[in-house]
Amino acid sequence: VGGTNQASGQTSKFIALIDSDESILDSLCDLIESAGLVARRFGSAEEFLEYDLHREVGCLIAEIEMPGMSGLELQARLKEEQCNIPIIFITSNGSGKTRIQAMREGAVEFLRKPLDLQLLLETVRAALDV
């Protein structure tokens, strides 16, 4: 994971995808990889933390509402660990209050499902500074 981008010779970071819904993970993975980026899937925030790959992540796309640790709890945990990964939250139910909290805590974007795939890719590229 994390190999070298042949064209630029730079070490590439991967996009971490976190959602408990396999079909969403499949779609996001296909989208990210079709854009020439490397994606890695995680079924929960806990699974992501278990792998301890923070330094290799270029951007994180996470569902706000997941069983176990929520996206907001993950954001707080990463902040505690002084890990400044750009986070894009996705949700089908998030309230305005949740959005404000996520953005106030440093999220790059907060997108509602069904996702505007072009906007998501543009947001990922901006987060990566590509």
Predicted segments, located by residue:
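C-terminal output helix
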Residues: K97, L115-R125
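Two-component/phosphorelay signaling modules centered on CheY-like receiver
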Residues: D21-R40, A127
